[in-house]
Amino acid sequence: MTPANPKPLANHHIAVLLGGPSAEREVSLVTGAAYAAALERLGARVSRVDPGKDVAQVLTALAPDLVFNGLHGRWGEDGCVQGVLETLGLAYTHSGVLASALAMDKAKSKAVLAAAGIPVPGGGLFDRHDVAQGHVMPPPYVVKPNAEGSSVGVSLVFEGANGPPRQLAAPDWAFGEQVMVEPYIPGLELAVAVVGESNGPRALAVTEIRSSTGFYDYDAKYSQGGSIHVLPAPIPDAVRDRALHLAKLGHTALGCQGVTRSDFRYDDINDLLVLLEVNTQPGMTPTSLVPEQADHAGVSFDRLVFWIVEDAYARRFAGGIA
């Protein structure tokens, strides 16, 4: 993973996708900027692309050696932009079309993960209007858009609540007609970063996330001080090893490539570890988990970015980086 040359990407033209039209645009702008800066430090010529409807024409005109995907949310991590890049014949980073689409769809990804023997939450899909009208399961439970990331649109309904979140019935609700409703799992929030390597995926570490509000929502993820990351997580060795194993298994079961982040809940009273989801485009902001875990494993951010590029080239071209 360590480049011998301090400028190993000299003479390489890399287009970084950042921003985009999703609800996670602001996070993507920060992630993409971090990627672009690292690539420039590694010697690459970088074109920053905030994709719109003309993204195919823009990328065709740029003709980059590689597209570095720094997008989050719909269109950027659900298989759509990956399909565009496949059609254009461009090498790109992170997971491909099918894995991206599966991981973004909570219902489908849970089915795949469960079939692989991975513990996942119960619950199911409901029409958002039905959920807004009354409890579809006894509280506490969690309501999530079926195809969003970064906890966008997520609500926690506590015991004693008079009813479910009213915003589900709002005319300006923009997160799809179906929502995933799952029983709330008490305990610890854990995360594991995984990097795919030629001899199999490697899980970096286990982080415990402690939110200042008690709920790891969008603000807790991306606001300074919104959460505290405890690395390594203060959990028994057996639980750590189980989380590392399940994260690698989830990465493989969904067919992911490059880097992913698996999010877990651990009920420490009942010793229950549950995989919530696998993120194929994990954040790379100053408050993000993957760069922290890489650093903990002795991998600098620039080395991590170089590895992502190296992995993408190796998948597209037999000779890897020229």
UniProtKB/Swiss-Prot annotation:
What does this protein need as cofactor? Mg(2+); Mn(2+)
What the entry lists under SUPFAM superfamilies is as follows: Glutathione synthetase ATP-binding domain-like (SSF56059), PreATP-grasp domain (SSF52440)
Protein's name according to its UniProt entry: D-alanine--D-alanine ligase
* Entry annotated with the keyword Plastid: no
The record lists Mg(2+) 2 as bound by: 277, 279
Q: Which organism is it from?
A: Caulobacter sp. (strain K31)
User: Which NCBIfam families is this protein grouped with?
Assistant: D_ala_D_alaTIGR (TIGR01205), PRK01372.1 (NF002378)
ATP-grasp domain boundaries: 110-310
